[in-house]
Amino acid sequence: SELKGKVKLIDFWASWCAPCRAENSNLLRIYENYKDKGLVIVSISMDTHKKAWEEAIQEDKLPWLQLSDLKGIGKGIARQYNIQSIPQTYILDAENKVIAVGLRGKELEETIDKAIR
């Protein structure tokens, strides 16, 4: 129910993925700017080692929901969502319709901004 009627950013990443880790600072800024305006972020890790995943969350100071089945790319949730490479993002509108895939940086923030208005 926390997700109902909100814009959702689903972020697929991993602790060992340098571009993913670099993008986390952008996600943090987006989170701070939009968390009180109707944005929910859920990050899904492609890690297979729980300790590395948890350490990356701490190091990057990621306050939103973090999930992982610890099965990596090509298995489990990654296979279910057809994740071939990371970072990968999905933006869902308030009605849970996918409105954008694969955005990063400024383009990601602009799309979220439009979806929330």
Where are these regions (language model features)?
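Thiol-/selenol-based redox modules, centered on thioredoxin-like
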Residues: 91-117
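Alpha/beta-hydrolase fold active-site loops
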Residues: 6-8, 87
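Conserved redox-active cysteine motifs that mediate thiol-disulfide chemistry
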Residues: 4, 12-29
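Short, internal strand/loop/helix patches
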Residues: 54-90, 94-95
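Short helix-capping segments at alpha-helix termini
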Residues: 33-37
